[in-house]
Amino acid sequence: MANSLVEKYSNEIAPAMNKKFNYDSVMEIPKIDKIVLNMGVGDAVSNAKNLDEAVEELTLISGQKPLITKAKKSIANFRLREGMSIGAKVTLRGDRMYDFLYKLINVSLPRVRDFRGISSRSFDGRGNYTLGIKEQLIFPEIDYDKVNRVRGLDVVIVTTAKTDEEARELLTEFGMPFAK
């Protein structure tokens, strides 16, 4: 799977991008740098078991052990202390990144209820794309019967593109289903 996306990039996407945007050097052609999956577990403050379940689910989804994120500062209203574990994140690069991207585009996103495409307005101005997923059940690795709480996660696709237009073109070429 990953190899097919890598081949598609080098054989089709990179030449098409170079033709469209007229780059001076082949090193200027945008590519996907990394994909970061982040799952914030706010209720981990009251129940640490929830964080363990989120870590397990993120491991199944990404194929790699997540890093547990900690609170940067205390917030009394949320009963939160500095240094408490409140989430998990995974940074995917290389083959695992392309495997995840393939799975996201071809398997997971089509499983979303009432799916009409993803928003093309979620670019950050520097060529990175952020996608919020409301429930982890769209991933085939997650067993519906073993889930006791529906959690969402953020997927950030970091590219080397300088502008949003270039990044949108790159992700469209990869097959990202943007809403018309």
Curated annotation (Swiss-Prot):
PROSITE patterns: RIBOSOMAL_L5 (PS00358). It holds the Pfam family Ribosomal_L5. The keyword Ribosomal protein applies. The keyword Transmembrane helix does not apply. One of its GO terms (molecular function) is structural constituent of ribosome. GO terms for cellular component: ribonucleoprotein complex; ribosome. One of its GO terms (biological process) is translation. Gene3D superfamilies: 3.30.1440.10. Keywords: Ribonucleoprotein, Ribosomal protein, RNA-binding, rRNA-binding, tRNA-binding. Belongs to the universal ribosomal protein uL5 family. HAMAP family: Ribosomal_uL5_B. Part of the 50S ribosomal subunit; part of the 5S rRNA/L5/L18/L25 subcomplex. Contacts the 5S rRNA and the P site tRNA. Forms a bridge to the 30S subunit in the 70S ribosome. This is one of the proteins that bind and probably mediate the attachment of the 5S RNA into the large ribosomal subunit, where it forms part of the central protuberance. In the 70S ribosome it contacts protein S13 of the 30S subunit (bridge B1b), connecting the 2 subunits; this bridge is implicated in subunit movement. Contacts the P site tRNA; the 5S rRNA and some of its associated proteins might help stabilize positioning of ribosome-bound tRNAs. This is Large ribosomal subunit protein uL5. It comes from Lactobacillus johnsonii (strain CNCM I-12250 / La1 / NCC 533).
